[in-house]
A protein has these predicted regions:
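Metal-dependent catalytic cores of enzymes that make or break cyclic nucleotides
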Residues: 6-210
């Protein structure tokens, strides 16, 4: 299922693969520094695998919005935000799947990876640890990838600039603990971005908004 969106969107490329790897290294550091989260290797594997499903709901978004080479109108942006709910509806249809833990994790990620620590995200306006941890981690990974890769509506920005933007809250607020782990794995994120770069990835310097 996670590969379907790569055929619909001109901006995805190896995005799904990077998100899985970013999520893994972020959670590995969090497991080391915050054992209270109970993040053993098995749990990290489930979360990083389920991270591949985070944008599956974009298959329900019209191509004209998904691949628009410019800023979205307010109405288009509201429609784009529906990908979180549409993805959950798709995953709910798989309720008889044998791996229920994976499916539950994927559902949480799909629905809540655009939530933010201060309640300013969507679709539910969750705040703090009411946001599932797996969705919090994928939110950081997704934001970094959106900033550092070319999209149809923007050019990539350098990794160092993206790093500072996330820490400064310019892309919404994230968990302070996750941001501490993000600092620790900054080099790994940059290395993974290079290793799994999209073909013909450019390193330009501007962006408009994240979708």
């Amino acid at each position: 299922l996670s590969s379907i969106i790569e055929y619909r969107s001109a901006e995805t490329g190896r995005h799904v693969q990077r998100i899985r790897m970013f999520t893994r290294v972020l959670l590995e550091d969090l497991a080391r520094t915050c054992p209270e989260y109970g993040l053993d290797e098995a749990r990290i594997q489930v979360i990083s695998s389920a991270a591949a499903m985070h944008d599956i709901g974009k298959v329900a978004i019209p191509d004209a919005i998904l691949n628009k080479p410019g800023p979205l109108t307010p109405a288009e942006y509201e429609r784009m935000k529906d990908h979180t709910i549409k993805g959950c509806e798709m995953l709910a249809a798989l309720e008889k799947a044998t791996d229920r833990d994976y499916l539950h994790c994927a559902y949480n990620i799909c629905r809540s990876h655009h939530e933010r620590w201060n309640g300013a995200g969507y679709p539910d306006g969750l705040r703090g640890d009411a946001i599932p941890l797996e969705a919090q981690a994928v939110g950081v990974a997704d934001c970094y990838d959106a900033l550092t890769t070319d999209r149809v509506y923007k050019q990539a920005i350098p990794p160092g600039e993206a790093f500072q933007m996330i820490l400064n809250g310019e892309c919404g607020q994230f968990s302070p603990r996750l941001l501490e782990s993000f600092k620790q794995v900054r080099g790994q994120f940059a290395a993974l971005a290079r290793r799994y770069a999209d073909d013909a990835q450019a390193g330009a310097v501007s962006y408009t908004h994240l979708r």
